[in-house]
Amino acid sequence: MGTVGKKKDRPAHGCSTIPKLALELKQIIHSTTHPKVPAVTPLRVMMPLGKLSKGASLDELIQMCIQAFDLDGNMGQNNELLQIMLTMHGFLIPSTELLIKLRTLYQDAMQNRSFSFCLRICYFIRYWITELWVMFKMDAKLTQTMEEFQELVRSHGEELHWRLIDTAQINSRDWSRKLTQRIQSNCSKKRKVSLLFDHLEPQELAEHLTYLEFKAFRRISFSDYQNYIVNGCVKDNPTMERSIALCNGISQWVQLMVLSRPTPQLRAEVLTKFIHVAQKLHQLQNFNTLMAVIGGLCHSSISRLKDTSSHVSHDVTKVLNEMTELLSSCRNYDNYRRAYNECTNFKIPILGVHLKDLIALHEAMPDFLEESKINVPKLHSLYNHINELIQLQNIAPPLEANMDLVHLLTLSLDLYYTEDEMYELSYAREPRNYRAPPVTPSKPPVVADWASGVSPKPDPKTISKHVQRMVDSVFKNYDLDQDGYISQEEFEKIAASFPFSFCVMDKDREGLISRQEITAYFMRASSICSKLGLGFLHNFQETTYLRPTFCDNCAGFLWGVIKQGYRCKDCGMNCHKQCKELVVFECKKRSKCSMGENNTLSDAGQLEVIPAGGKGLTNDCLGADEGPYSYPNGDGDIHTEVSKDRTIMLMGSSAQKISVRLQPAVKHRATQTENETQSLCLQVPSPPRSRTPDLTSHLPISPMPSPCPSPVPTRKKAYAKWENKDSIRKARAELRGGKAGIQELEKEKVFLKEENTALKIQLKDAHRRVETLRAELRKYVLDSDTHQKGS
């Protein structure tokens, strides 16, 4: 690649954005040209502001916009002023109030019989509707005010004016702005499309990531940029939030795909592949996705993998260093700005860098000048910066997208992990070596701060849509005989393309996977990885119910005499056989459990290596040896959903599954006097044990030093102490007295209510049976009497 962005004829950028903005402001005010001003974007042809450089009132700006139209509706020389006023007025006044001002001017002009001025107002509004019709689609109050304006115009009998401001044309617009109108899916390839990560070329992967990035980028409107500048965050800004979530999702996906490989050699292969993907992204001039990929590769959870790095060639490492230097934040992203300004045609900027520039410009320049006049040069400068980002949306990328691969990537990028969880996975692969000097965790040097901490969670409807599209693509490419099944081998290869993998599924046919089974598989996987609450997989077991029971998933009745359905032994959830693979509710393990259900327990933070090739595995992913978690002192209510332990499953190319159980990030109050427990350990699961309770399993496990403690110094693990239920109740009674007694009574009350409800159902069923028997008895007696009389 060579040295990136080293031009001697360009002045070096400063470390701050403010001096640059001051130079640009000076250029606007004095209407002079400054050679090679280090602006955020290439120099634009500035509109000479003239007297507007000293500011103007809002009414004066409105009058100038109206007078820009002649009686035939043609515009004069203030075309850019119209654009600035209509796009940037949100900094000054809401759109509804601007329309109300125009309506007031129209009423006054009608009273003064100034019909030419009324006509110009209508031309101005028509221009607003034509150029910025999205505002009327997204703002309900603005639409309502426009309807009131139309009624006012009709009441005066001005049919021509009414037609000019008619908003019916908006409904015919394709306002959804679908990307497929500009980038057609690749239908020319007749070969079988591979959906496997190992078979994808870096060029192909980079193109489809660019497709997704451009799709999110081009949906950001003027108002979205304005809202971010004013609020400084993405709250109530869904399009901006989706763009940031995609960037974070790609960064985490890169890390997880590396960590999903079991050996350093395989991890080095994935690492090398993503570096080549970064090269292709640079060639496509997609800097935003390039930032996400390099940020993932430079993350501490990846950079600490010394064994993995030792298998990466020197040339590949050199390319990574060059990319990191290109995206470095030194000198206010000087290298990136030079490379970006030299690019022509299609390009996707690093959105976070340009948003920071916009905020700096907004903060550096006042909104008003002397005599409460609007700072028009500030609006003009903000408009030029935002408008360049908007204009980039009109340039289609030079690529062809395969929608099947797009659907697979869309689903695999729905990932939301915390920093601690990423470190847990990293330490599971390469535990800390105490002989080597400790690696100080640090943030990646290229990740923009604006994107950190933004993880909008998709709703179940969105996840279901992504899963359904991906499953349709899988069966279109792999179900050649169209019988609704794919082979077990093909399914395992597809599942290995994701940075997560869960349990071995039940198959309707030997060696075949149905559409329903693969849909249920990815629904459960996506629900867990997107943190929708499914923190634990259910431990379903076939059960015979002795009382009427309903399915907790579909609310249907569990029919049958024996083995009517399945019951989770951890949380008690009941469901049909056909519903147990479709459950997307979290398995909330109960603190109360019988002695027979508690076998040998794992330490907090324990990691289990589970071979996936065995045929004896069932749908129980956590194994029969893992018991429910309980808080000895009844403090489970203080642990929020964020601090709940969570299971992450990974599967590498060798079909070996790793289950990393993540524990709460704070130490439990009941164990403040205990030593810190083991953080992570490797254990091969033992053969299934008998259900006879083992007394040794209830003894406290001796604490062991952690072989790979968390990189966060203050982070400690919870220690679970398992005791008999009676002893727990006695301890609570001694420590809490009356309060514990009240809590126990409330729990008993809830339990009795449940029992009472079940007994009522049984009683009603018994009454129905009695009535049925009575009816049959009466019928039998009547038939007997009739027979006797006949004889």
From Swiss-Prot:
Positions with a binding annotation for Ca(2+) 1: D479, D481, D483, Y485, E490
PROSITE patterns: EF_HAND_1, EF_HAND_2, RASGEF_CAT, RASGEF_NTER, ZF_DAG_PE_1, ZF_DAG_PE_2
Family from the record: Belongs to the RASGRP family.
Sequence ranges assigned to domain Ras-GEF in this UniProt record: 201-432
Free-text note on domains in this protein's UniProt record: The phorbol-ester/DAG-type zinc finger is the principal mediator of the targeting to membranes and is required for functional activation through DAG-binding.
Residues holding Ca(2+) 2: D506, D508, E510, E517
Stretches the record annotates as Disordered: 671-715
GO CC aspect terms: cytosol; endoplasmic reticulum membrane; Golgi membrane; plasma membrane
Protein name: RAS guanyl-releasing protein 1
Subcellular localization, as worded in the UniProt entry: Cytoplasm, Cytosol; Cell membrane; Golgi apparatus membrane; Endoplasmic reticulum membrane
Zn finger spans (Phorbol-ester/DAG-type): 537-587
Bias type Polar residues, positions: 672-681
Compositionally biased intervals (Pro residues): 702-712
Primary residence: cytoplasm
Keywords: Calcium, Cell membrane, Coiled coil, Cytoplasm, Differentiation, Endoplasmic reticulum, Golgi apparatus, Guanine-nucleotide releasing factor, Membrane, Metal-binding, Repeat, Zinc, Zinc-finger
Domain EF-hand, chain residue ranges per copy: 466-501, 502-528
Underlying gene: rasgrp1
UniProt key word Cell division: no
Membrane topology: Peripheral membrane protein
Primary role: Functions as a diacylglycerol (DAG)-regulated nucleotide exchange factor specifically activating Ras through the exchange of bound GDP for GTP.
